Curated annotation (Swiss-Prot):
GO (cellular component) term, any one: cytosol
Domain GMPS ATP-PPase positions: 199-386
Pathway annotation from the record: Purine metabolism; GMP biosynthesis; GMP from XMP (L-Gln route): step 1/1
Domain Glutamine amidotransferase type-1: 3-198
Protein's recorded name: GMP synthase [glutamine-hydrolyzing]
Main enzyme class: ligase
Active-site residues, record numbering mapped to chain: 80, 172, 174
PANTHER family xref list: GMP SYNTHASE [GLUTAMINE-HYDROLYZING], GMP SYNTHASE-RELATED
Amino acid sequence: MQSVLVLDFGSQYTQLIARRIRELNIYSEILPYNTPADTIRTHQPKAIILSGGPNSVYDQTAFMPDPAIFSLGIPVLGICYGLQAIAKHFGGVVASSNKHEFGRSKILVEQQGDNPLFQNIPNSDVWMSHGDKVMQLPEGFRATASSDNSEICAFESTGVNSPAHIYGLQFHPEVQHTLYGKEMLGNFLLNIAAITPDWSSKSFIEHQIEEIRRKAGNNTVICGISGGVDSTVAAVLVSKAIGKQLHCVFVDNGLLRKNEAEKVMHFLKPLGLHITLADSSDLFLKRLKGVASPEKKRKIIGRTFIQVFEEQIHHEKFLVQGTLYPDVIESISVKGPSETIKSHHNVGGLPKRMKLKLIEPLRELFKDEVRAVGRELGIPEDILMRHPFPGPGLAVRVLGSLTHERLEILREADEIYIEELQASGLYSKVWQAFAVLLPVQSVGVMGDKRTYENVLALRAVESSDGMTADWAPLPHDFLARVSNRIINEVRGINRVAYDISSKPPATIEWE
């Protein structure tokens, strides 16, 4: 399978570059900006893309790629900072510009001579995000596009006193605001690099089945399954590879949505998985009694989950995890692991403690690709399009201390909210939606009597990957209907609010 390497210089758009490449049915990987050329050679890429970044190439601490990558004979495309890094390396002049360019800008494409990167692309709007610019081209390079504020918006090497097939774009072709960005990437990858677009869900599945069989051999494998998209797709893919060697465990921690355990077991049954239901709800709730701190809740739930999961491990040698590519990128990127905002509840501590070897069949995929693989595997759409649900469950949606009564209040209210979203055709239009029971009571009037009851918040967000999110502008009449139903049908709530915070600065979940 032919591939492209994206070297990460710290751009907020690096993952987007990789995703745009995959949309062209070409496999892409992200590596740190300083990956040695010898390492790159072992990957045998057909092209290299240098991402943007927040730094200036003329700073003493500027990030620069291994110079030897330009001698590999592989086409290279620099984007924004990547263009400037190429210009500096080959002797061009890069400096701070008096006129910064941020947002939309119109470029003029050079029409004289051959211009393969801009083949069949007219003058058009692009997305700029730079304060520095190339003041003077290196020897052996020519400008191929310009804007009002930048005479050099794009360039290419001529192959005379410079290597062949080195290209640069000062703007961001990966961003949707660049009207012909996908076509530019297509020109570079399909025409200039002559890559065969052979990356697809089907080819991925075929490759992973071979890898899983090779890795697992005749050993038994265990998988914690939650009913969410990632764990379900991972389990079905592994099951397709090794069949009855896979043992799945669904842990009921007492913090699930209304009838969640029964629903999950019901819709997973037709998928042919061997699943054990471990009902440990009493144990979880006993240990969480009186605990109000969200971080303490997460830690208790995490430790208890490991204990319960450990009891289900017998002779298994491997553990399946639904790790996705953004998790992998986070650990190897130029920025390194981000500051921990919340501790994450998963079974990440199990392999070291239990001496289990990992099988991570989805570690090369983004979220949308996981769903595409799920469709190829025949997993029903209503499973694939389920909204994300946090590992700690309702423990982080009932703010403050947990009680059976408060959990039941939230379950009833949340079910009404989701039911109305589905009935209105809105469920599939938002990334995630849920209710939150606040540790606040308010005065109300019901039946001419004073009430002093709980406040509930409704949350719905729009996102593509959960890394950033905007609050969803749900119709007012819809919110009024949901609020009216909850207050009338759920005993213990007399006020409903709607959360209009985006991420950042807020997180999607409240705790």
